[in-house]
Swiss-Prot record:
The keyword Cell membrane does not apply. This is Lipoyl synthase. [4Fe-4S] cluster 2 binds at residues 81, 85, 88. SMART domains: Elp3. Pathway: Protein modification; protein lipoylation via endogenous pathway; protein N(6)-(lipoyl)lysine from octanoyl-[acyl-carrier-protein]: step 2/2. It comes from Ruegeria sp. (strain TM1040).
Amino acid sequence: MRDLKIPEQRHPEKAHRPDNAQPKKPSWIRVKAPGGKGYAETHKIMRENNLVTVCEEAGCPNVGECWSQGHATMMIMGEICTRGCTFCNIATGRPDTLDAFEPGRVAHAVQKLGLNHVVITSVDRDDLEDGGADHFAQTIRAVRHRSPQTTIEILTPDFLKCAPEVLETVVEAKPDVFNHNLETVPGLYPEVRPGARYFHSLRLLQRVKELDPSIFTKSGIMVGLGEQAPQVKQVMDDMRAADVDFLTIGQYLQPTPKHHAVDRFVTPEEFESYEKAAYGKGFLMVSATPLTRSSYHAGDDFAKLRAARNAKLGLA
């Protein structure tokens, strides 16, 4: 039995990699330690429903703030991923079989937490013929049935090894926001995201809009991996060409010495510059700060996103 709390067992595919020193974080990266009544209650509900969260599995720096407010990003289809991205702290290996009761448990937890907005993500499941598309759809429908007032945001894998039709299965379940992260600039894909294809991910986002223009599309990248500013701005252009509505940009933080090294810590002023550039390119919503993550403040951001589209359409 693997102990996923031990890095060597959590990431066996990274054992051959040399150790990379983990640099000291600058003052603008510091966060408070998790704790408090709200945090404990969120933790309790997750455990009672036997649910996995990306907040814990990926070591998100914002877990204390989000959980104290009763917000958690639920990760479906297990805690073991079939990919081995060099930036990611999710365990890699052979996943367990799908849990048919998981969609219902997610819906129960959403209701129990009283969420106005929920973010649901997953590991990559290249072992499944549909990549887990039907499981995503079932989870969306279960939440809709139990909490019809809750808006639903999904953060999906790329379905790279699946038939193109599987994307329709997810879109037909009508999430409010479809998020798929490009993660980094295309030049870094061979090292950072070797199991993925940049232009496939772009096309997936574009296809969502073609299938259902009412669904908001969202994507994000990390900076501090070794990219240059012109490359980041080219990614912005590529996303806008794919009609992506919402862009997130955050600082890459190295989970362990075996992971991709932090090239540098991008300053808050540089993030402000990226945000300004992105709005200038036509994104409806941009979140670009050192601690920005895909689901950070997602509920508040969704309200702003919807207001921005209404204003653009003259409905405000």
